[in-house]
């Protein structure tokens, strides 16, 4: 067996463009390794409008393999759409491209590289890339700041906010910007939670700069002052007060003392729990009780006519032994991953939805499989074996139709995921959607996914058959450049809760297919729990004594 090559660290990339003529700029990052000719989408910056020299706050993290040649394909694009599929480069409005290697980047002084971006050999602007090697800690840090007697930059008061910068060989990099507090020279800012590696790259003694500004609606914001410190100094609590210094005022006034005082009224390291911490708690759980996080599963099966006549061997639903179709293989792969990777045995009956069938002489896009065989839900077997038994009984009786709609099933799944969910008994649900073509209710589906992002639910699409999917991949944050979906009334997806997998891409290697199915689940579950401020066994951060790490 070949040895798995592990990254030695992560590289954090920051970007700046110059001399750009297009109104809306964004950078998409692709990467390959070694002799691979395929560039994989890594991520994207935010979009910045109406700036010829945009500096992007969004950082892109890439695993760094010392022994491999890792080529970057950086694409500067212009767009003003809500969503784009960044995997389809030919559909993007390209400003220019740049193709360095990570090795070339980190070998430069200050790990800073400036180059020309080109479109069809024509220079269309410049790009500046700054790299930093960071070390993952698995922790977050919570900070809350209180200001006292800040300078009055307006007639009677100030509208203060602050920025945090971390030092680097190429200069300071911004890591956080707070919201503005109106008309208050004694502000108490909201608590902030930052990943420790983003704040200091894993170094507790790295210099941090806190800048305080007065916001103005018409003229430029005005600097109140700043101070420097490091994470260790903040957490130790030795320094109780940090004077804000405005160097310009200090040089002009002989009696100048400071422009205000800052206190850290809260500063703690928050251990970031893993999915295993939630499922197993203190090690005595099985993912199905004991006060730990329950894992619940729902399955939705495509019953549209594009599957083909289920009695024929050419049908995607043909499932006569020894033949095992892609629907069944996907179900078994999911069961295997839940048990082997997370120790979860599904001991409850799994709800099975169908969509795209004729029910009572009408197309139905949200029905329950047990109704097809006139069976009571409580008589069915638990787990995936129950799903397969129900599938084998129901599929021969179903009349397939069209179109393909799944939004109402996601709506129901969201509602089910919230049932019996509370802080003393956590539960997280998975909706597995097995589908053979793109959806026709895309906008409604986006709306429901946006709502589902606030619920304890992950949505996994597995595309079966030979269809080349177009719109479903755009629902997956990894495939659209980590752009959050936007639904009705400009409601925004708060986290990436969707994963799309095409079965045919893994038809040769079933092990890779199994590993891919639940690859995103750990981050999706822990991100939701972090959003809700829950710790394993239902404790919240405010209820838990967390030791400071020095």
Curated annotation (Swiss-Prot):
Keyword Repeat: yes
SUPFAM superfamilies from the UniProt entry: C2 domain (Calcium/lipid-binding domain, CaLB) (SSF49562), vWA-like (SSF53300)
Species assigned in the record: Dictyostelium discoideum
Protein name per its UniProtKB record: Copine-F
VWFA domain mapped to chain residues: 296-521
Coiled-coil region(s): none
An example Gene Ontology molecular-function term: calcium-dependent phospholipid binding
GO cellular component, one term: cytosol
GO term, biological process aspect, one: cellular response to calcium ion
Record keyword Repeat present: yes
This protein's UniProt keywords: Repeat
C2 domain location: 1-115, 123-246
Cited PROSITE patterns: C2, VWFA
InterPro entries: C2_dom (IPR000008), C2_domain_sf (IPR035892), C2B_Copine (IPR037768), Copine (IPR045052), Copine_C (IPR010734), VWF_A (IPR002035), vWFA_dom_sf (IPR036465)
Bilayer-spanning residue ranges: none
């Amino acid at each position: 067996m070949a040895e798995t090559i592990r990254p030695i660290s992560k590289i954090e990339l920051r970007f700046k463009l110059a001399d750009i003529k297009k109104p809306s700029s964004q950078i998409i990052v692709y990467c390959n390794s070694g002799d691979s000719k395929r560039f994989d989408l890594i991520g994207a910056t935010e979009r910045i409008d109406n700036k010829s020299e945009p500096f992007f706050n969004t950082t892109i993290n890439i695993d760094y393999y010392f022994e491999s040649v890792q080529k970057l394909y950086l694409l500067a694009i212009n767009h003003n759409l809500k969503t784009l599929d960044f995997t389809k480069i030919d559909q993007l409005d390209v400003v220019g491209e740049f193709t360095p290697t990570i090795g070339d980047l980190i070998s430069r002084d200050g790990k800073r590289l400036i180059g020309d971006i080109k479109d069809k050999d024509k220079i269309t602007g410049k790009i500046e890339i700054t790299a930093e090697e960071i070390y993952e800690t698995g922790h977050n840090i919570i900070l809350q700041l209180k200001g006292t007697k800040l300078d009055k930059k307006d007639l009677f008061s100030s509208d203060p906010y602050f920025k945090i910068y971390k030092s680097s060989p190429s200069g300071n990099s911004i890591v956080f910007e707070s919201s503005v507090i109106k008309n208050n020279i004694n502000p108490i800012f909201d608590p902030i939670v930052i990943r420790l590696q983003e704040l200091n790259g894993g170094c507790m003694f790295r210099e941090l700069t806190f800048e305080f500004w007065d916001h103005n609606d018409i003229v430029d914001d005005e600097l109140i002052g700043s101070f420097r410190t490091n994470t260790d100094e903040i957490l130790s609590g030795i320094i109780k007060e940090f004077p804000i210094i405005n160097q310009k005022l200090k040089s002009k006034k002989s009696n100048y003392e400071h422009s205000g005082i800052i206190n850290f009224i809260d500063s703690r390291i928050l251990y970031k729990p893993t999915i295993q911490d939630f499922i197993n708690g203190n090690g005595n759980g099985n993912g199905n009780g004991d006060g730990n996080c329950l894992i619940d599963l729902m399955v939705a099966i495509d019953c549209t006519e594009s599957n083909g006549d289920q009695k024929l061997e050419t049908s995607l639903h043909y499932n006569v032994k020894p033949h095992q179709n892609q629907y069944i293989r996907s179900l078994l792969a999911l069961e295997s991953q839940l048990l082997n990777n997370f120790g979860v045995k599904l001991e409850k009956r799994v709800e099975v939805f169908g969509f795209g069938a004729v029910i009572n002489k009408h197309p139905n896009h949200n029905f329950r499989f047990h109704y097809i065989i006139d069976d009571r839900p409580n008589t069915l077997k638990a787990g995936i074996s129950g799903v397969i038994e129900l599938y084998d009984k129901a599929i021969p009786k179903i009349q397939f139709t069209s179109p393909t709609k799944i939004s109402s099933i996601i709506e129901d799944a969201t509602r089910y995921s919230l049932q019996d969910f509370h802080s003393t008994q956590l539960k997280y649900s998975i909706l597995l959607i097995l589908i053979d073509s793109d959806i026709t209710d895309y906008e409604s589906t986006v709306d429901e996914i946006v709502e589902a992002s606030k619920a304890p639910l992950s949505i996994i699409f597995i595309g079966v058959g030979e269809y080349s999917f177009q719109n479903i991949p755009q629902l997956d944050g990894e495939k659209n450049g980590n752009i959050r979906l936007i639904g009705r009334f400009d409601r925004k997806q708060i986290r990436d809760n969707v994963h799309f997998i095409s079965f045919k891409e893994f038809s040769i290697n079933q092990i890779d297919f199994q590993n891919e199915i639940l690859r995103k689940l750990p981050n999706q579950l822990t991100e939701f729990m972090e959003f809700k401020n829950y710790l394993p066994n239902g404790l919240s951060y405010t209820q838990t004594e967390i030791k400071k790490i020095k």
